[in-house]
Amino acid sequence: MLDSVEITTRVEEILNAHKGMEGPLLPILHAIQADFGYVPQAALPIIAQDLNLSRAEVHGVMSFYHDFREDPAGNHVLKLCRAESCQSVGADRVAAHAQKALGIEWHETTKDGKVTLEPVFCLGLCACGPAAIVDGKLVGRVDEARIDAIIGGLK
């Protein structure tokens, strides 16, 4: 676990790197997440003060964009498409299978810390649905057997 001094130091370095940038909040949040693997709650008031925003404004942006994490992810991130096109070809069944196989729900990480399961909306692979992203790599035509193979490769 990171201490508040380390968080403050690293966040201030990121803020300084974005000085003078127009509309820096999103790039700052992305940089913090790239550095920490998530955006620590302790970073929000530091960002707010530096950008002359309220904490609510910073939190609002954080919560609006689904890719920002408030907690560290597992070693691997499995994202399953939840858009209508994928749902029409079995994404709900695939999602239920993945949740059961991993023993977790959406936005949770397995007890061993290896896999985080997240919903994502439209990956642009509609013709190859159900679709997924495994550690940033797109995967199409995902079914229960493919989910089992993916999960097996992540553990």
Give the role of each language-model region:
Residues 1-155:
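Signature of N-terminal electron-transfer/Fe-S-associated modules in redox systems
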